[in-house]
Each structure stands twice: as structure tokens, then as C-alpha cells.
Amino acid sequence: MPLRLSLRIFDHEPARPSGAQVWRGGATDLATRTMIADPPRWLTIDEGSPVPAERPALREWMLEQINPGDLPSPENAGGVILVSMNVDPEREEEFNDWYNMEHIPHFNRLPGVIAARRFRATLGHPRYVALYHVETTNIYATPGWMAANETPWILRMRRFQRDRTYFMFRQRIA
């Protein structure tokens, strides 16, 4: 059975639901491959029943883990990198093949990556979300990470991706 989780991004520090991971970070500057700390963002990763938020989230998803199907959120990460996107419907089958056969396995072999996982939204937008639990978010600017994002297949698939968002979260607060 695939793992299901609730994922939310806030512009304020949220309540700390029991059992959920809460991270502080920000959007990602793609030119410098660093986190934009101002304005700060908070991420909650909840594998239990989501707790209603006191204030609305900027983004909210209910997700079903696609690959690997049942791996829980690691507890020992030093950071989380989140990428979300939509894909052109006519390329969705190839997109899923690429992500499952090349991208996620490649990232799971990179030194410093604790877990690379991908999800499909049952609620929320964009439809696809990838979470990378890492030893440090500095990995995002390393030659290994950048090379993994420059394969011929990823360059082809990038043309069919839409609504991409990138976030980094460096500080776990719960």
C-alpha cells in the first residue's frame, strides 16, 4: 500500500501537529542554487491524519507516494528539498517512466541524499511532488546534484513540465 501524507507550505510558523515534521526554509533561487530566506516559509510533512490549520496554507497537498511506494519520511535529515510540477498530459507516461526508472534511482545513489521520493497529488496543485531528504541543502549546488539534472532524458522531459516550484527547508523545528 502506498504511503499517504499531507504536505503544506505556510508563510507563518504553523502549529506543530503531533508526529508531523515541521521545517523552516524558503523558495529556491535557481540562478545561485541557494535558499531565499526572506520571506521565510514553513513546511509540514504529516503521515497521520492532517490537523486543521489555524490559518490557510500557501500550498497544500494530499499525496500518494509513487516511488518508492511505502518509504516513510526519514527522521535524520539535515534538510528537505521540495520540487513540484505538472506535466503535459500527452507526455505523462514517459514522464513517469523517466522519474521512476532514471531520476529517483539516480538521486537515491547520490552521496548526501538520505531519501528521494515522488508523489502524486490526490488533492492540490501541481500534481507531482518530489521530496529529497538530504544531509544538507548545500547538496543542491554540488557537481553530483547538478549532473543528475543534466542527463539527456531529463533535458527532454523538462520541455514538458509546467508550473514548477522549488523550495529548500534547512531547519527542522519539530
Q: Language-model features: where?
A:
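Macromolecular interaction modules
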Residues: 1-174
